[in-house]
Amino acid sequence: MTSLPLTPVNLDAPARRAAMPPRHLADLDLAGRQALVAELGEPRFRARQVSTHYFGRLVRDSGQMTDLPAAAREKLTDRLLPTLLTPVRELTCDDGATHKALWRLHDGSLVESVLMGYPDRVTACLSSQAGCGMACPFCATGQAGLTRNLSTAEIVDQAVYLAGVAASGAVAGSPPRLSRVVFMGMGEPLANYNRVVAAIRRLVAPAPEGLGLSQRHVTVSTVGLVPAIRRLASEDLSVTLALSLHAPDDGLRDELVPVNQRWKVSEVLETAWEYAARTGRRVSIEYAMIKDVNDQPWRADLLGRLLAGKLAHVNLIPLNPTPGSRWDASPKPVEREFVRRLRDAGVSTTVRDTRGREIDGACGQLAAAEGDEIVGPGAP
């Protein structure tokens, strides 16, 4: 492997100060919604009515909330149900089991969401930022850079929309109910900490306050922001932590995951074990298999030694190369040998089911393709 120049990551730089979207009911807890409704001169129970439509019936269009008086509906729409996500493109593949949505936000930013159906569950993959500032060189989103953080409601609205798709029966061969959420779309979730945690609380709160998902069915991915992982451990949330490791040694991880230049593999893993001990939740170790880069047998053995005896599971990810990238997925025999060595070390290991390749399913690819169509290849 030819060494890459190390890419510094400025973690202290805030996301670009773009105008945030208008306030939405998903930005507020039920008490906050009731207070806002009262300010509008409406009875407080209207907040519960609107929340029941949105979270309980998955209705995002106030025009369908016909039990509300027309005058009240107009006022509440302006203040509680502004349009946050405008569909740009919606694609389906895997015989109807995978649905991908590309959204334009109020400021023109593009974000993606994916719905994946399985025989026993339906999973939504949500974006937490427009773009990403972590600069991982094999990731389409990381190469695009960070535009801004998403609001709590922009995150939640993705889930509510996808839950509606599932409820419609459109996901072939799957139950008609969203059951899991993974924060593995565009962005580094823990770099948008407050809004992501608020979104999780909406997702797991029972209807009409929230979507009613199980905390244990929510997964938060991170490249390893150590202080934020420790903070998440103190939130009294039983969500799964997914650590995007991608290399077991600092020399390579400094290149693949530039944040490793601040928090090394040993510190990141130690913090992950602290999270597991505090929450009782097994940590998922995410590892993209990149041909001739991080797939050598000795790296499998090193990873096995680091994880042996820990409350962890390795999720190997066949790389979905971005257009024009010099990165490629590891050959299947190499992948199988990597799995064998990890399992021989006593480490629980699976290979992620690849989804959405024919529709630019990897994080950031659809937005990148749309951006090229809008502004032209090579535009800044």
Swiss-Prot record:
Subcellular location: Cytoplasm
Cofactor stoichiometry and binding remark: Binds 1 [4Fe-4S] cluster. The cluster is coordinated with 3 cysteines and an exchangeable S-adenosyl-L-methionine.
EC class (word): transferase
Disulfide bonds: 125-363
EC number(s) on file: 2.1.1.192
Active site: 112 (proton acceptor), 363 (s-methylcysteine intermediate)
Catalytic activity: adenosine(2503) in 23S rRNA + 2 reduced [2Fe-2S]-[ferredoxin] + 2 S-adenosyl-L-methionine = 2-methyladenosine(2503) in 23S rRNA + 5'-deoxyadenosine + L-methionine + 2 oxidized [2Fe-2S]-[ferredoxin] + S-adenosyl-L-homocysteine; adenosine(37) in tRNA + 2 reduced [2Fe-2S]-[ferredoxin] + 2 S-adenosyl-L-methionine = 2-methyladenosine(37) in tRNA + 5'-deoxyadenosine + L-methionine + 2 oxidized [2Fe-2S]-[ferredoxin] + S-adenosyl-L-homocysteine
One GO term describing the cellular component: cytoplasm
UniProt keyword Iron-sulfur, yes or no: yes
Any single Pfam family the record assigns to this protein: Radical_SAM
Principal place of residence: cytoplasm
GO terms, biological process: rRNA base methylation; tRNA methylation
Keywords linked to the UniProt accession: 4Fe-4S, Cytoplasm, Disulfide bond, Iron, Iron-sulfur, Metal-binding, Methyltransferase, rRNA processing, S-adenosyl-L-methionine, Transferase, tRNA processing
Sites where the protein binds [4Fe-4S] cluster: 132, 136, 139
Cofactor: [4Fe-4S] cluster
GO MF entries: 4 iron, 4 sulfur cluster binding; metal ion binding; rRNA (adenine(2503)-C2-)-methyltransferase activity; rRNA binding; tRNA (adenine(37)-C2)-methyltransferase activity; tRNA binding
Transferase as UniProt keyword: yes
Annotated Radical SAM core domain residues: 118-358
Residues where S-adenosyl-L-methionine binds: 187-188, 221, 244-246, 320
Known function: Specifically methylates position 2 of adenine 2503 in 23S rRNA and position 2 of adenine 37 in tRNAs.
Additional remarks: Reaction proceeds by a ping-pong mechanism involving intermediate methylation of a conserved cysteine residue.
Stated family: Belongs to the radical SAM superfamily. RlmN family.
Protein name: Probable dual-specificity RNA methyltransferase RlmN
